[in-house]
């Protein structure tokens, strides 16, 4: 358990990963300083303020990656920082200035704030699988030594390219700065994060993960040879590595691999009411899975709790409960008949 007097800061706290991490940190006994862009926007922060222990152990702080020095105050006095915030605008018209530069400068600004505070014991950065395997030819297995090909991303400009570039360049710049300035810095590299969630809107990773249900064809390529982790496993790994005295370097956090064909087979069996496609234009019927190795994370003692089915059922249930994906009419009628109106969003 965290000490009740131990304060930690979570950036991007209202988002998909950030809000679940805040919930788990509060449960573990930490006092949490949550940074958000606008603490007065009730629609964006209500799910944080409604959390158990929020009244006594949670404070909201205004900070923005584009505003240099805006995290200093929230980080001052904290013993740990979880930097989760990242610009996620795949439709940006000016990706260099709206996504890439703010991501790099924002992470360096967090590192500088940790230095200035003089109280921060460890900084945990949520990186991305997009820093590892985005390259022309996929390897069968990836580990923490691999880095994405930034020039390949810039030339091909696939869906999400600016996110992959921004996270890769930011993490590389941060490692250089952390080593030069002797900062205890670790990065966690999640693959596609799936599961139930607290935020009121559709998380970007579920737009991708649930793309066969949502018919988001431009995202099929991302999950062609997919790797997945449950949101709860990811957040628990953050706390585990923060507390572990020997944690160092990069850690891939991924529990399952599945090709798009394996994924839709499971989704079609689970949700026959959605007309989920079985053929995907430009995607071979015979795909080999691509594996992201979490060997390093497992070897330090972390154990994953959730199955691939757990992730997707949790995600679909949460989306339905929040009205983000339609429930087909026949399913609604069946639910009403059996009084199944209480949809669990997970814990």
Swiss-Prot record:
Pfam family, one: Epimerase
An example Gene Ontology molecular-function term: dihydrokaempferol 4-reductase activity
Residue positions binding NADP(+): 44, 163
Activity-pH dependence: Optimum pH is 5.75 with dihydroquercetin as substrate.
One BP term from GO: anthocyanin-containing compound biosynthetic process
Enzyme class: oxidoreductase
Keyword check for NADP: yes
Keyword field contains NADP: yes
The reaction(s) this protein catalyses: a (2R,3S,4S)-leucoanthocyanidin + NADP(+) = a (2R,3R)-dihydroflavonol + NADPH + H(+); (2S)-flavan-4-ol + NADP(+) = (2S)-flavanone + NADPH + H(+)
The enzyme's E.C. designation: 1.1.1.219, 1.1.1.234
Result of changing residue 347 to G: In strain: cv. Conference and cv. Pyrodwarf
Keywords assigned by UniProt, alphabetized: Flavonoid biosynthesis, NADP, Oxidoreductase
Family: Belongs to the NAD(P)-dependent epimerase/dehydratase family. Dihydroflavonol-4-reductase subfamily.
PANTHER family hit by this protein: NAD DEPENDENT EPIMERASE/DEHYDRATASE, STEROL-4-ALPHA-CARBOXYLATE 3-DEHYDROGENASE, DECARBOXYLATING
Record function comment: Bifunctional enzyme involved in the flavonoid metabolism. May use dihydroquercetin, eriodictyol, garbanzol (5-deoxydihydrokaempferol), dihydrofisetin (5-deoxydihydroquercetin), dihydrokaempferol to a low extent (5%), but not naringenin, 5-deoxynaringenin or butin (5-deoxyeriodictyol) as substrate.
Name under which the protein is recorded: Bifunctional dihydroflavonol 4-reductase/flavanone 4-reductase
Native source organism of the sequence: Pyrus communis (Pear)
Gene: DFR
């Amino acid at each position: 358990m965290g000490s009740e007097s131990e304060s930690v800061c979570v950036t991007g706290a209202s988002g998909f990963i950030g809000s679940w991490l805040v919930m788990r940190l509060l449960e573990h006994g930490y006092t949490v300083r949550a940074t958000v862009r606008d603490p007065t926007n009730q629609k964006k922060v209500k799910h944080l303020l409604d959390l158990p222990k929020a009244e006594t152990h949670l404070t909201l702080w205004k900070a923005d990656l584009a505003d240099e020095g805006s995290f200093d105050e929230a980080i001052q006095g904290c013993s740990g920082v979880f930097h989760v915030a990242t610009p996620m605008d795949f439709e940006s018209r000016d990706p260099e200035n709206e996504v890439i530069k703010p991501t790099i400068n924002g992470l360096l600004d967090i590192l500088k704030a940790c230095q200035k505070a003089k109280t921060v014991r460890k900084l945990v950065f949520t990186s991305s699988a997009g820093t590892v395997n985005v390259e022309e030819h996929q390897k069968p297995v990836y580990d923490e030594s691999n880095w994405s090909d930034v020039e390949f991303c810039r030339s091909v400009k696939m869906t999400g390219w600016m996110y992959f570039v921004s996270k890769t360049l930011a993490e590389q710049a941060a490692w250089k700065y952390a080593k030069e300035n002797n900062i205890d810095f670790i990065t966690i590299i999640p693959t596609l994060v799936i599961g139930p969630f607290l935020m009121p809107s559709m998380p970007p990773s579920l737009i991708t993960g649930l793309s066969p249900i949502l018919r988001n064809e431009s995202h099929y390529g991302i999950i062609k040879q997919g790797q997945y982790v449950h949101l709860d496993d990811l957040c628990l790994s953050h706390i585990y590595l923060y507390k572990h005295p020997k944690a160092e370097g990069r850690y891939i956090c991924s529990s399952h691999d599945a090709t798009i064909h394996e994924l839709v087979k499971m989704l079609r069996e689970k949700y026959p009411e959605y007309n989920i496609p079985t053929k995907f234009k430009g995607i071979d019927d015979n795909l080999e899975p691509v594996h992201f190795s979490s060997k390093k994370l497992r070897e330090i003692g972390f154990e994953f709790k959730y199955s691939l089915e757990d992730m997707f059922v949790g995600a679909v249930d949460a989306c339905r409960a929040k009205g983000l994906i339609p429930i087909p009419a026949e399913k609604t009628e069946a639910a009403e008949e059996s009084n199944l109106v209480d949809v669990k969003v997970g814990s």
